[in-house]
A protein has these predicted regions:
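Conserved C-terminal structural/oligomerization subdomain of aldehyde/semialdehyde dehydrogenase
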Residues: 1-99
Length: 99
């Protein structure tokens, strides 16, 4: 089952590749968190984690950014442009010219 709540899991890893493998070894993917003294490394790892959102070094939630999960954590997005688009229907009208 997917856990909804703050959970801190500490698992030892050998190297960056192993850490990413462990993080992605789940059928769920709602949110993740990366902490590192090396900001470029943290960003590189964050790009490879398969979750709908990854926070780096304590970043707060940005309500202008889309929020939603990967894998069994659902589809669709809330917030941001992607969240608004979930409620819109696109329509194309061809041949509409002024008389």
């Amino acid at each position: 089952e997917e856990i909804f709540g703050p959970v801190l899991v500490i698992i030892p890893y050998k190297d960056e590749e192993d850490a990413i493998r462990i993080a992605n070894d789940s059928q769920y993917g709602l949110s993740g968190f990366v902490v590192s003294k090396d900001l470029e490394r943290a960003r590189r790892v964050a790009r490879r984690i398969r979750t709908g959102q990854v926070r780096v070094n304590g970043a707060k939630h940005d309500f202008s950014a889309p929020f939603g999960g990967y894998k069994y954590s659902g589809n669709g997005r809330e917030f941001g442009v992607f969240g608004i688009e979930e409620y819109l229907e696109a329509k194309s009208i061809c041949g509409y010219f002024p008389a």
